[in-house]
Amino acid sequence: MRFKSIQQNIEDEGKVNVREVNPDSYAERDHGYTAGIFSDAEENFGITQQVADSTQNPTSKPKSRHAHFHETVHENPSEYSRSKCKQPTNEKEYDKAIEALVAKAIVEEHSGQQFPVYKGLEQYTLLQKMGDGAFSNVYKAIHNRTGEKVAIKVVQRAQPNTDPRDPRKRQGVESHNILKEVQIMRRVKHPNIIQLLEFIQTPEYYYLVLELADGGELFHQIVRLTYFSEDLSRHVITQVAHAIRYLHEDCGVVHRDIKPENLLFDSIDFVPSRVRKYRAGDDPDKVDEGEFIPGVGAGTIGRIRLADFGLSKVVWDSHTQTPCGTMGYTAPEIVRDERYSKGVDMWALGCVLYTILCGFPPFYDESISLLTKKVSRGEYSFLSPWWDDISKSAKDLISHLLTVDPESRYDIHQFLAHPWISGSREPTFPATDAPNTAQRENPFTYDFLEPEDVAAAGSAARTPGVNSLREVFNISYAAHRMEQEKIRKRGQRGNQGIMNFMGDMDDLMEENDDYDDGTKSVEHSMKRVNLSGENDPSLASRQPAQSQQQSSQRSRNKFKGFQLNLSKATLYNRRHRQKV
């Protein structure tokens, strides 16, 4: 009965609208009562399913899935609930929806863009592919009746394995993993978190219908703008922090995968800068970030939205308000486990802040093993000249987030109270293990390739270097999650009772499987992409001969401390060529 508290919590908060689509008729099933026809494991997550009446007319017009979802979810309204669907109330709104569909159909007809036909999504028209993963695709779509634009995550269900060499291997995502993500997403309602609108399943796929953030990924804006100003960085990271605070303190959830790819944004109108400001080492052709408007944003970046809860887990139960235990009887080991779990998100917050301020991640190496070692040891630096013009207060804040010891790392309340965030003029101090911000890096030469102007984030995201950078983020965060898991398990040794209890929680969250499978997948992806660029003819052709010789020479040299070969990372190519 280890699932009892979470099960009760879900029942108290209301049911998730889960729709099972009949593969024969694909008619809408909506009978008005729920029955648990999932397996026992699925029921333990508090997920219910709509069951069809055998006498239902398969030709009857289906109701709006969105309308039924909100009837169910808003039995207990939340102050953060703001995800009501746009329901046309007059002929004019219906005309607009139809016009949008026709316009898009014309565009697609001329572009020749085609999408798979997914049974169960007949009420939606797919407009654009926004991203993909090993077993999933994300599409921008429009609801055929209401005209509401949404994002739909299409996840392939695990199918029976036909490979006799590995009978345990299954292609696709297991039901308990996707249902865990759904269970967590339906609990959270916050303006800085993408909302789950509907969950649909067929024999082949799971469909997560999500709110659409029209700006796309923050990652693409880092590529486009190279880096963000301190004002825009503060605007972005503060919103992410508020989402984390809500998850940690109000929901008892840790995200465990906070990175630029999973930070989406609502776009705003661009206002050109009245006076352009440049930092040392900037390319004169750097894209204008635009005028920062307090409370609104800059560079088309408005409201930030946290997405993708595939690696999330619950660390405490809302009934006891304590970390996974009974009030007043919680062992120190479990309290520390909650601290370690939340610390993973705070570390990631520091990585994101570092990256958006300077344009590259704090941990980088072409070797996966060396990269993971640097992450586990916290070996980073504020590289000159790119950090020379960034305030000491910002560096101090980052140092408190990237400290190796989770007991010393800032929690979300300390982060939000820091002078750089709050805007106070109080003096700030670095963490005890922070790098020396006054020391200049070892005097070796950075050679940059001549950059090609990136006209749009979409084209930039398809370059080999950008794909490599994505994998650097993935490896860095996976390595840190595993390191924190080792620390947590070491702290549990010697107390078998606690080990058994936490073992149950591990089973509930499948966190060990997440770590192992996720890391193997990322390492495989890393091996497929070309981190170095040495074998990429398109990069080699743009690199001057002298640069190639110097790059080869640097690979034979040994430097102490943090090593970063900037000539081989495409994101850096947008920076001005300069000798340090």
From Swiss-Prot:
<keyword id="KW-0547">Nucleotide-binding</keyword>
<keyword id="KW-0597">Phosphoprotein</keyword>
<feature type="region of interest" description="Disordered">
    <location>
        <begin position="51"/>
        <end position="91"/>
    </location>
</feature>
<feature type="region of interest" description="Disordered">
    <location>
        <begin position="530"/>
        <end position="580"/>
    </location>
</feature>
<feature type="compositionally biased region" description="Low complexity">
    <location>
        <begin position="537"/>
        <end position="554"/>
    </location>
</feature>
<keyword id="KW-0963">Cytoplasm</keyword>
<keyword id="KW-0469">Meiosis</keyword>
<dbReference type="GO" id="GO:0042764">
    <property type="term" value="C:ascospore-type prospore"/>
</dbReference>
<feature type="domain" description="Protein kinase">
    <location>
        <begin position="124"/>
        <end position="421"/>
    </location>
</feature>
<dbReference type="InterPro" id="IPR008271">
    <property type="entry name" value="Ser/Thr_kinase_AS"/>
</dbReference>
<dbReference type="GO" id="GO:0005524">
    <property type="term" value="F:ATP binding"/>
</dbReference>
<feature type="binding site">
    <location>
        <position position="153"/>
    </location>
    <ligand>
        <name>ATP</name>
    </ligand>
</feature>
<dbReference type="GO" id="GO:0071470">
    <property type="term" value="P:cellular response to osmotic stress"/>
</dbReference>
<comment type="function">
    <text>Delays the mitotic G2/M transition by promoting nuclear exclusion of cdc25. During osmotic stress, inhibits the G2/M transition in a sty1 stress-activated MAPK pathway-dependent manner.</text>
</comment>
<dbReference type="Pfam" id="PF00069">
    <property type="entry name" value="Pkinase"/>
</dbReference>
<keyword id="KW-0418">Kinase</keyword>
<dbReference type="InterPro" id="IPR000719">
    <property type="entry name" value="Prot_kinase_dom"/>
</dbReference>
<dbReference type="GO" id="GO:0044773">
    <property type="term" value="P:mitotic DNA damage checkpoint signaling"/>
</dbReference>
<dbReference type="GO" id="GO:0005737">
    <property type="term" value="C:cytoplasm"/>
</dbReference>
<dbReference type="GO" id="GO:0010515">
    <property type="term" value="P:negative regulation of induction of conjugation with cellular fusion"/>
</dbReference>
<feature type="binding site">
    <location>
        <begin position="130"/>
        <end position="138"/>
    </location>
    <ligand>
        <name>ATP</name>
    </ligand>
</feature>
<dbReference type="GO" id="GO:0106310">
    <property type="term" value="F:protein serine kinase activity"/>
</dbReference>
<dbReference type="GO" id="GO:0005730">
    <property type="term" value="C:nucleolus"/>
</dbReference>
<dbReference type="GO" id="GO:0051321">
    <property type="term" value="P:meiotic cell cycle"/>
</dbReference>
<keyword id="KW-0539">Nucleus</keyword>
<dbReference type="GO" id="GO:1900181">
    <property type="term" value="P:negative regulation of protein localization to nucleus"/>
</dbReference>
<protein>
    <recommendedName>
        <fullName>Serine/threonine-protein kinase srk1</fullName>
        <ecNumber>2.7.11.1</ecNumber>
    </recommendedName>
</protein>
<keyword id="KW-0723">Serine/threonine-protein kinase</keyword>
<dbReference type="GO" id="GO:0005634">
    <property type="term" value="C:nucleus"/>
</dbReference>
<dbReference type="GO" id="GO:0010972">
    <property type="term" value="P:negative regulation of G2/M transition of mitotic cell cycle"/>
</dbReference>
<keyword id="KW-0067">ATP-binding</keyword>
<dbReference type="GO" id="GO:0004674">
    <property type="term" value="F:protein serine/threonine kinase activity"/>
</dbReference>
<keyword id="KW-0808">Transferase</keyword>
<comment type="similarity">
    <text>Belongs to the protein kinase superfamily. CAMK Ser/Thr protein kinase family. CaMK subfamily.</text>
</comment>
<dbReference type="GO" id="GO:0034599">
    <property type="term" value="P:cellular response to oxidative stress"/>
</dbReference>
<feature type="active site" description="Proton acceptor">
    <location>
        <position position="257"/>
    </location>
</feature>
<feature type="compositionally biased region" description="Polar residues">
    <location>
        <begin position="51"/>
        <end position="61"/>
    </location>
</feature>
<dbReference type="InterPro" id="IPR011009">
    <property type="entry name" value="Kinase-like_dom_sf"/>
</dbReference>
